[in-house]
Amino acid sequence: MTISPMKILMVHANREERGKLAIMLARFEHPVTFSDGIDSLEFNPDNYDLIIVDEHLTGGAGILLLHKFSKKIRKKTIYLSSGDEKVRAFYQNSLEIYECMRKPVKPMNLAVVACDFFVSSHFNNGELATLNS
């Protein structure tokens, strides 16, 4: 089974941190586009297969950006939060996002969650009919 490269948007104000996280995703040949804040977003989230949003952005909190997204977009979003387990569970359940990961995020852990998202989205679309694909 192979999964084609998926387009990822990473919204993260810290250039060094987003670079570390993106390197691991790029190793799996997923093209990653960057934005640093909610005010400078010049993208259409519908054009991406996965969106990763940090809690601290230029121009405001990442949670404000999540509230701007439609439910459809939030379902394909990973949110990076320093909140405790209860806070992260609240974000994930109330906003119906795919995953809320605890910061600091290890690049490999982010890659695993992204891979899980891609595989589950293929299953949900009925694209993996057999294991021989």
What is each stretch, according to the model?
Residues 13, 80-85, 104:
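Conserved active-site segment of CheY-like receiver
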Residues 14-33:
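Two-component/phosphorelay signaling modules centered on CheY-like receiver
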Residues 18, 39, 52-73, 85:
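Conserved phosphotransfer microenvironments
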Residues 33-50:
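Acidic, metal-coordinating helix/loop segments flanking the phosphotransfer/catalytic sites
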Residues 51, 100-101:
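Two-component signal transduction core modules
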Residues 64, 83-100:
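Alpha4 helix (beta4-alpha4-beta5 surface) of REC/receiver domains from two-component response regulators
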Residues 105-114, 126:
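C-terminal output helix
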Residues 115-131:
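The C-terminal output helix
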